[in-house]
């Protein structure tokens, strides 16, 4: 008799965005003429930059000729892409990385979910609350989180770090020792950021406690303000304790193309039951060479084109487009009387629901009355209750139309 990994039974009944899709589809069946505008799930709408398309076309043509055909590539990524990543994303900020410290992958979602495999099941993990669900769900699958408390909306063995309105949506250090710390800045879902000084507090904590920070920096390209670090490695000592995840998905429109990378410095040590240290970099390389065959050559060629002079201009134009959407949403909601966070250094706007209205209640009200779909804050954790996320990844026309509807119908 085949038996399941019973940790899967501890997961919520459905993934957050699957539940949203179910409700939207149900509403559309009942209201077939409704013009639904989706400002919920964080998929992009702008096409790939022309320079990326041309690079991928050329790479595909190379694959069609015997003399330039490539089979399996290096699991860690082609040197031509890793060199550009280091030279453009890190060196200008004073961060020195080795070629063997960057791992090209098919997405930050898979990397943030998979990286926990290296950690022992008894490690204590900490997450911000609200939080991107993948961090929690992947650890539930591994058996690291304990059982789910329905009343609290939390797992018994996770240390939750509340991000509250009173605390400006920024987490405080855990009061008990933890081993794994998930941080995402610019944050999904709140859109907030940390200063270098605030980030240093976390790095210092991790160094003192031999903890490891799993730092999701997928939205760093959207940072507009000076003084906001784009990489955790801008903080002294971070190379000893932090893994950084980045993605081309939102930066360059690769959500349907799939390319990202993870930085694992060779300075980071992880310990066995005897206290002996082991290289986290070597363990992640071992994991990747066992379970991953690398990102396709045409996709990596497209990602490398992002770093050309023309590529940088085209990508920046797309980022500017989305951040103008963010401004429209943020200012429109403020004009309508909503309290909002984010939308300045991130494509996410985190709004407080009216009065005592719950997140899912507001979701239904917004969909039925304004025909606009967002993401209920409760789907990101117990502390997301009473909040709602909108994203700036829609078209300009739909973004403007959605905000006008909200201002007119949701007062």
From Swiss-Prot:
Modified residues (N6-(pyridoxal phosphate)lysine): 250
Gene3D superfamilies xrefs: Aspartate Aminotransferase, domain 1, Type I PLP-dependent aspartate aminotransferase-like (Major domain)
UniProt pathway annotation: Amino-acid biosynthesis; L-lysine biosynthesis via DAP pathway; LL-2,6-diaminopimelate from (S)-tetrahydrodipicolinate (aminotransferase route): step 1/1
One GO biological process term: lysine biosynthetic process via diaminopimelate, diaminopimelate-aminotransferase pathway
Cofactor(s) for this UniProt protein: pyridoxal 5'-phosphate
GO molecular-function term, one example from the UniProt record: pyridoxal phosphate binding
Identification of the protein by name: LL-diaminopimelate aminotransferase
Organism listed in the record: Desulfitobacterium hafniense (strain Y51)
Native organism taxonomy: Bacteria, Bacillati, Bacillota, Clostridia, Eubacteriales
């Amino acid at each position: 008799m085949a038996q399941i990994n019973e940790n899967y039974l501890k997961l919520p009944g459905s993934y957050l965005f699957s539940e949203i899709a179910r409700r939207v589809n149900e509403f559309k069946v009942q209201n077939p003429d409704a013009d639904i505008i989706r400002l919920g799930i964080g998929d992009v709408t702008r096409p790939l930059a022309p320079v990326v398309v041309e690079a991928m076309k050329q790479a595909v043509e190379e694959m069609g000729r015997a003399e330039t055909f490539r089979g399996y590539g290096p699991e860690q990524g082609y040197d031509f892409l890793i060199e550009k990543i280091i030279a453009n994303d890190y060196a200008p900020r004073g961060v020195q990385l080795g070629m063997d410290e960057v791992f090209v992958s098919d997405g930050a979602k898979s990397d943030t979910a998979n990286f926990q495999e290296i950690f022992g099941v008894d490690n204590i993990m900490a997450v911000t609350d609200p939080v991107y669900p993948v961090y929690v769900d992947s650890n539930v699958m591994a058996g690291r989180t304990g059982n789910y408390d329905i009343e609290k909306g939390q797992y018994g063995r996770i240390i939750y770090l509340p991000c509250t309105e009173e605390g400006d949506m920024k987490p405080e250090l855990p009061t008990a020792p933890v081993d794994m710390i998930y941080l995402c800045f610019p944050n999904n879902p709140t859109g907030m950021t940390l200063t270098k000084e605030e980030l240093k507090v976390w790095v210092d904590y991790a160094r003192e406690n031999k903890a490891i920070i799993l730092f999701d920096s997928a939205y760093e390209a959207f940072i507009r303000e000076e003084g906001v670090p784009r990489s955790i490695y801008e903080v002294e000592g971070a190379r000893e304790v932090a893994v950084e995840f980045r993605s081309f998905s939102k930066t360059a429109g690769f959500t349907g193309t799939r390319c990202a990378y993870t930085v694992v410095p060779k300075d980071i040590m992880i310990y066995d039951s005897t206290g002996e240290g082991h290289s986290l970099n070597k363990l992640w390389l071992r994991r990747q060479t066992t379970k991953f065959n690398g990102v396709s050559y045409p996709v990596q060629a497209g990602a490398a084109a992002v770093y050309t002079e023309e590529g940088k201009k085209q990508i920046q134009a797309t980022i500017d487009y989305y951040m103008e959407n963010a401004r429209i949403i943020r200012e429109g909601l403020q004009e309508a009387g909503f309290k909002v966070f984010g939308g300045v250094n991130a494509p996410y706007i985190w709004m407080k629901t009216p009065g005592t209205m719950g997140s899912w209640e507001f979701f239904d009200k917004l969909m039925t009355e304004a025909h606009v779909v967002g993401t209920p804050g409760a789907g990101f954790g117990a502390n997301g209750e009473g909040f709602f996320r909108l994203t700036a990844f829609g078209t300009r026309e739909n973004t403007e139309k959605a905000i006008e509807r909200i201002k007119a119908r949701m007062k």
